[in-house]
Amino acid sequence: MVVIGEHRHTQVTVDLQAIKTNISNEMAQKDELTELWAVVKANGYGHGIIQVAQAAKEAGATGFCVAILDEALALRAAGFAEPILVLGITEPEYAPLVAEKDISLAVGTQDWLTTAAAILAANQVTTPLHVHLALDTGMGRIGFQTPEELATAVTTLRQPQSPFDFEGIFTHFATADQADDTYFTHQLNNWKHLIAVVDELPRYVHVSNSATSLWHQACNGNMVRFGVALYGLNPSGRELSAPYPLQPALSLTARLTFVKRLARGKSVSYGATYTAAQDEWIGTVPIGYADGYERRLQGFHVLVDGEFCEIVGRVCMDQLMVRLPHEVPVGAKVTLVGTDGARTISLQDIADYCGTIHYEIACGLAPRVPRVYID
């Protein structure tokens, strides 16, 4: 059971209109034959899988991509009838359930096809199982690596009375978000070499994650897996500029729960790692590393009533402390991600401070923090 903190003043706010705008801007770059499938894995990158999926559908997304079968089942349970592709490997034992729920699976080995076919036959499943063949062109994660392996799989899928529907074929580029396109070109050449053995391509041919779609449009195929950019986050971080403005959808706010005057020489938080050099005002914010706000963010800053305030002392499990410029009333707004007045703190800012990527920060926001949606 997940307990959501409905009775404390800390929340994630998700702007669904920003998500719709990002999708609309992306679709405006494509021809009308190219479909956009919204990637809503990992609880919609921390934004909320069901609410994001609904917004994406309203904006024109015609399908969804997830990482695990349970995410696809959650979408079906919520009433979504659109195509859903599970991008990770699903155990063959679940093939009958997948076929029943009309879900598509990524497949990367002949052994998987052989095992799943036997299981489908043993369970007398007559509904075809939708398959997208994954090609490993250089990501090194999952997929067929040689033309011979791929040709064998295609032959299996096209046998008479096959229990499979050969619905799609795809790859994933590892460096599409980098200015140096050397390795991208290497992968693209591998893709062309592999796919040449498929004499008749399936309905969906897709190579584009957000980065590929933004900066390598010439090889888009006929479907885009629109992921992190859907949420208004630049997949390249600060290295490449997006061809159109991305609107971040997520903000994280709280309110001060305690304010005190700290005397010079007094310390704050575990380990007494911060000691006041002079008398100062300290505010307590009801969020901590159990909420996904990293312990390593000591020394970073938040916005209190539009002013930057440093996080002092170690971030605790459920609370953190900030140094205030002056006495501020309990209940004052604290912005941890987002804009207050003329100042902004982005997920990218936090990621830079933590030495990671904004994906990790967004996905790490715990379900204990309630999500509030505006549209």
Curated annotation (Swiss-Prot):
This is Alanine racemase. The keyword Phosphoprotein does not apply. GO terms for biological process: D-alanine biosynthetic process; peptidoglycan biosynthetic process. Belongs to the alanine racemase family. Catalyzes the interconversion of L-alanine and D-alanine. May also act on other amino acids. The active site is at residues 41, 270. Substrate binds at residues 141, 317. The modification N6-(pyridoxal phosphate)lysine is found at residue 41. Its cofactor is pyridoxal 5'-phosphate. It catalyses: L-alanine = D-alanine. GO terms for cellular component: cytosol. Keywords: Isomerase, Pyridoxal phosphate. The keyword tRNA processing does not apply. Pathway: Amino-acid biosynthesis; D-alanine biosynthesis; D-alanine from L-alanine: step 1/1. GO terms for molecular function: alanine racemase activity; pyridoxal phosphate binding. It comes from Lactiplantibacillus plantarum (strain ATCC BAA-793 / NCIMB 8826 / WCFS1) (Lactobacillus plantarum). It comes from the Bacteria. InterPro entries: Ala_racemase (IPR000821), Ala_racemase/Decarboxylase_C (IPR009006), Ala_racemase_C (IPR011079), Ala_racemase_N (IPR001608), Ala_racemase_pyridoxalP-BS (IPR020622), PLP-binding_barrel (IPR029066). Its EC number is 5.1.1.1. Pfam families: Ala_racemase_C, Ala_racemase_N.
